[in-house]
Amino acid sequence: MPFIGDSSAIIAGAETYGLYYRILNGVGGFKAKSTAKNSITLGWNKGATASGYQLQQYKGGKWVTVYTGTKATSTSYTVKRLKANTSYKFRIRAYKTYGNTKQYGSWSKVLTVKTKR
């Protein structure tokens, strides 16, 4: 199922405006495909309606985008320049592009992965 659901709103006043949007599903199958001393390869399932994906890493007390995949067919990414024997946290979400606007789905559960010694 590509979408969780549809929603709409009508704003009435001096003029009436309508708004319609779809809520994307979260990304499924998010996991570590492989680990090395200085890198982690992450993978996920292709979203049926996704235009791309946003991958974030938790660094310095905040979430930082490390990858924005602009192709819906991209289902893996290797995060490099990591420290050996260290745990890292990641999360991902899909987005759908409508014209110049990106509509984001919900974030995945946080994935914690440790690099090798």
Where are these regions (language model features)?
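Structural signature of eukaryotic scaffold interfaces centered on beta-propeller domains
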Residues: 1-10
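Structural motif
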Residues: 15-21
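Residue-level signal for short segments within beta-strands and strand-turn junctions
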Residues: 21-23, 57-59, 94-98
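Pro/Thr/Ser/Gly-rich low-complexity, intrinsically disordered linker/stalk tracts
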Residues: 22-49, 84, 101-117
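An aromatic-rich alpha-helical recognition segment common to small helix-rich domains
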Residues: 27, 44, 55, 79, ...
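Hydrophobic core positions of the immunoglobulin-like beta-sandwich fold
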Residues: 32, 77-80
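Extracellular low-complexity, O-glycosylation-prone stalks/linkers
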Residues: 47-69, 74
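Beta-strand-rich modules
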Residues: 79-99
